[in-house]
From Swiss-Prot:
<dbReference type="GO" id="GO:0005506">
    <property type="term" value="F:iron ion binding"/>
</dbReference>
<keyword id="KW-0752">Steroid biosynthesis</keyword>
<keyword id="KW-0503">Monooxygenase</keyword>
<keyword id="KW-1133">Transmembrane helix</keyword>
<keyword id="KW-0560">Oxidoreductase</keyword>
<keyword id="KW-0756">Sterol biosynthesis</keyword>
<dbReference type="Pfam" id="PF00067">
    <property type="entry name" value="p450"/>
</dbReference>
<comment type="similarity">
    <text>Belongs to the cytochrome P450 family.</text>
</comment>
<feature type="transmembrane region" description="Helical">
    <location>
        <begin position="30"/>
        <end position="50"/>
    </location>
</feature>
<protein>
    <recommendedName>
        <fullName>Lanosterol 14-alpha demethylase</fullName>
        <ecNumber>1.14.14.154</ecNumber>
    </recommendedName>
</protein>
<keyword id="KW-0479">Metal-binding</keyword>
<keyword id="KW-0153">Cholesterol metabolism</keyword>
<dbReference type="GO" id="GO:0020037">
    <property type="term" value="F:heme binding"/>
</dbReference>
<keyword id="KW-0444">Lipid biosynthesis</keyword>
<keyword id="KW-1207">Sterol metabolism</keyword>
<keyword id="KW-0812">Transmembrane</keyword>
<comment type="function">
    <text>Sterol 14alpha-demethylase that plays a critical role in the cholesterol biosynthesis pathway, being cholesterol the major sterol component in mammalian membranes as well as a precursor for bile acid and steroid hormone synthesis.</text>
</comment>
Amino acid sequence: MAAAAGMMLLGLLQAGGSVLGQAMEKVTGGNLLSMLLIACAFTLSLVYLFRLAAGHLVQLPAGAKSPPYIFSPIPFLGHAIAFGKSPVEFLENAYEKYGPVFSFTMVGKTFTYLLGSDAAALLFNSKNEDLNAEDVYSRLTTPVFGKGVAYDVPNPVFLEQKKMLKSGLNIAHFKQHVSIIEKETKEYFQSWGESGEKNVFEALSELIILTASHCLHGKEIRSQLNEKVAQLYADLDGGFSHAAWLLPGWLPLPSFRRRDRAHREIKNIFYKAIQKRRQSQEKIDDILQTLLDATYKDGRPLTDDEVAGMLIGLLLAGQHTSSTTSAWMGFFLARDKTLQEKCYLEQKTVCGENLPPLTYDQLKDLNLLDRCIKETLRLRPPIMIMMRMARTPQTVAGYTIPPGHQVCVSPTVNQRLKDSWVERLDFNPDRYLQDNPASGEKFAYVPFGAGRHRCIGENFAYVQIKTIWSTMLRLYEFDLIDGYFPTVNYTTMIHTPENPVIRYKRRSK
């Protein structure tokens, strides 16, 4: 098989040699250095493809059956263009043709998808030493969060850090957060006036940062969140891009430089707040204090750099989920005015006719609003793909996935498979009144992941979104503009609504 791969390489060299020579003459004008650089790039690309092909062939154990492979005639890029244009359609078509497990190549990497609850169980039940997260996510998150936290550390250390953060995301804190978020929301929407048309995704993204910073970072850091710092967060958030995923971090791209500068400046803000809190010795019951008091199993306390990195990670990891989900839910409610009015009336039924300030216990009883969030997360999960790198051979559905494959689950596809969901494309919050809306399948609904990989910020996200939308429903009625319901923007890593402008009108008292 390796010999066959070698013959393939020779064929490519022979076929490409004359074409390359002609192209080089035209592009470089005969400049020797330019011609050498292009020739080297061409040769290295072919060697890379040879190693990829040979590796794909020899890494399977004897007698093992590899997943169905979707061939592409396009070298290196593979299916990147088709997938990037319409990833959900691509995966659903592949599922219909090849079944729940299949592989394909994009940008020189082989991806194996596990669609449907049974196949997805492999990823969600896996151990990190078999299907590894750091190998996939570190290059994306480390420049944003910083060294020494999250996917930059061995998994046991990361698990300890997650446990520290989770201890601060508790009901006692959530009860404090509700009034904070309600106050921030009312203040933010004062500038909207009586009626108008606004980019609701942009507005909610700003509001999510304000509320999350206040709740998760403490009053010292929130007090410094002005327009300049908000732009730093935006630049840092810009580090979550396709370019950052695919290209080396040392490249001098403008977005990389903005990301790195923002990281340094935000860290400095955090360092000052951390030092001020340490020196004051004032014990404030918030997550910043939780981290300052926390220790690893060996008794070592967190450094200021670790605390700052974990606070950045906590904010930005949840910011996408909450802002995207909040915006999409606004459009679903604007499209169904009857449902929107039911959500408003639920506020009066649960909280009181005069709509007093919200409490955590009231939030828990807003069941219809809760189901609307759940259904929004089903049809528009912010994270379309969850990935791991196979470090050991993995067997699923009779196939063996070799080491080196990026193993993927798509919540977007799993949560709308016709094999699992009745009226799968309809926005129907009442489906969750049933005990088993997805035929009892364990991994059919996974917007926050599952098992040991489940997101620790899920409960905070629900508190945040329910409080914001409770306040918004009390303030305004929302409508689509000329019936326009946004399409999905697949060019970003978080799948946001295209042209997310909504019409609003203040409710009469």
